[in-house]
Amino acid sequence: MSNQPSRTIVQENNVLRLRPGSEPTPSSSNQQPPQQEQQQETTSTKKKKKKKAPKVRWTEGTVDNEHMNKKKTKICCIFHPQRSFDEEVEDDKHNHSCSSSDESSDSSDNEGDKDEDESRPSNGIPKPNAYEYQPHYENRSKLPEQG
């Protein structure tokens, strides 16, 4: 091998290159101008920068969560509106006044029935859970039409 500043190694007509390029001619195989090397490096780095990340595109059926132009695929928050103290007291009185004087003396039966009574309204149909319940929107102009 010769003692030249080139980065190529020639072994019996086989050329090993560190960088991809065109086939070298015998006269220019050992020396390449440094300006061409720099141009090759800059063009290869420019090509790598052109990659773009995929963008999310929402369909018309996607929920506009909280009417703040935030598109979501799920309803993730359970909202309980604040009530005044008077409303809370009235609800508590109503729930406790429903119990009649014909309560059984067995307290274990009452405790088991209490859980069922809270989850079912007076008509016997269970209440939907937070993910099954669809909130009532006052401004229906922002919602898609249901067909």
Curated annotation (Swiss-Prot):
Keywords: Nucleus. It comes from the Eukaryota. GO terms for cellular component: nucleus. GO terms for molecular function: protein phosphatase 1 binding; protein serine/threonine phosphatase inhibitor activity. Residues 22-43 have a biased composition (Low complexity). The keyword Nucleus applies. Transmembrane segments: none annotated. Residues 1-14 have a biased composition (Polar residues). Residues 103-118 have a biased composition (Acidic residues). The keyword Nucleus applies. Residues 45-55 have a biased composition (Basic residues). Residues 135-147 have a biased composition (Basic and acidic residues). It is found in: Nucleus. Residues 1-74, 87-147 are annotated as: Disordered. Belongs to the YPI1 family. Regulator of type 1 phosphatases which maintains protein phosphatase activity under strict control. This is Type 1 phosphatases regulator YPI2. The gene is YPI2.
